[in-house]
Amino acid sequence: MNRLSVAGAIISLFLAATPAVAQQASRCADCHFAQNTVPNPDHLYDWDRSPHARNNVGCEKCHGGNATVFEASIAHRGILNPANKQSPVNRANLPATCGGCHVGPFVAFQDSRHYELLKGGDQHGPTCSTCHDPVAGQLLSPKALEKQCSQCHGPKEVAPRAERARNARQMYESLNAIRDQLKLANAMIKRVDDKQRRADLMNEYEQASVPMTRAINAGHKFVYGELDEYLKVAQERVEKLMAHIANRAN
């Protein structure tokens, strides 16, 4: 029995002695971090710093496989190369895979022209990883997003309306600014001592968050007129909320 097999046997005995709930945790990263020859380690490092890792959304949730064992042949059984059209992380299947958790954005994306292109086999059709980090999930910066959009809506004129790339950047800059204001407001509300005032402010915070959610969904439909309208409503509500927090208005 080689050293890896012995280590696997010891780990298996340890897992057998742990509660059933703990055994359900994803073990992919544990094994991959222990190997010096794992391909594409940056992929693993990105995941480890991501909200996915913090919420125990392991590799198997997207790639498949068995995340409860340490024997590579068993753990990797059923995992397909992303180039395989049956793979859940193939670019055409990625929206449905991500949509298993991110339902709202997936439903909105299905209403877009981009989704039609993607499902029709158009290689220019964007998928989730076009705009989001494929592992960490964060949206690209507004400038990086503009660059992505300009590959089609730009000088090459693969698609019409070259101004859309610039408009997308500007709108996502606004979205990020409002999101930062909401984050600040939430932190300030939590420090309010009076329970009734804190509850009233939190209700106002939630009302300001509604158009933000709708703006994000409009972004996933790529309907930028709708996105802009929701951002204006969100901005108005956030400004009013911040004034109330500062006690400048009733």
What are these regions (language model features)?
Residues 20-250:
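Short sequence/structural segments immediately N-terminal
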Residues 1-4:
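Positively charged n-region of N-terminal signal peptides that target proteins for export
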Residues 7-17:
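Bacterial N-terminal signal peptides
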